[in-house]
Amino acid sequence: CKSAILVVFGEMDWEKGWTQQFHYGAIRNNNSKMFKLLGPDTGFDSIGEFTTAKAMAKFLDRLNSNGKLTKTILYNLNPCANEVGNFQDGTVAGKIQFGSGWWFLDQKDGMEKQMNALSVLGLLSRFVGMLTDSRSFLSYPRHEYFRRTLCNLVGRDVENGEIPISEMERVNQMIEDISYYNAKNFFQF
């Protein structure tokens, strides 16, 4: 029943030209003593290990087979599930996105691992960048931290000769795109 509802929502997103986003991999409210004391969602969560790949692939395939697979961003919490690479069809650049590191992974190491995995299996240049937890005002500074981490990562690649220094104009444009324009264009704001 849950998957049928998700399919209907996915089709509705496709009809509206919207993007569907899935955050998965968390085990919530694990410390019962603190849960009783402070309530839900107060920082006592863990990275989970779930077998979501088959179910997610079937879900996306069903939408794709019906011609109604909308733009999709997948955010995983467990870094062992970083690699994603199905259902690109050329209609939208980066149609299926590997979302930015979040929760336990929205720190330097987690962000770098996510961007490196994306670079290996996709196009970093099409990445829509950092997300914001709009429920928390304090989450907004992570965009600045993300941009600095992105620039350091790409700068190291240039210093190591992995990106030719003669391509700096393209590199600069890629940084601007990841920091702003890709999201603007992807979400059609």
Regions found by a protein language model. Name each.
Residues 124-125, 142-189:
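Mid-to-C-terminal alpha-helical segments outside catalytic/metal-binding sites
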Residues 96-106, 129-131, 160-172:
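A generic structural motif
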Residues 1-71, 81-95, 113-129, 147-150, ...:
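Histidine/acidic residue-rich metal-binding segments in metalloenzymes
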Residues 25-29, 77-79, 101-105, 135:
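Active-site beta-loop-alpha junctions enriched in small/polar residues
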Residues 46-50, 141, 170:
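Alpha-helix capping and helix-loop boundary segments enriched in small/acidic/polar residues
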Residues 23, 133, 183:
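Divalent metal-coordination and catalytic microenvironments
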Residues 134-135, 139-143:
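Catalytic grooves of carbohydrate-active enzymes
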Residues 91, 105, 109, 137:
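C-terminal catalytic subdomain
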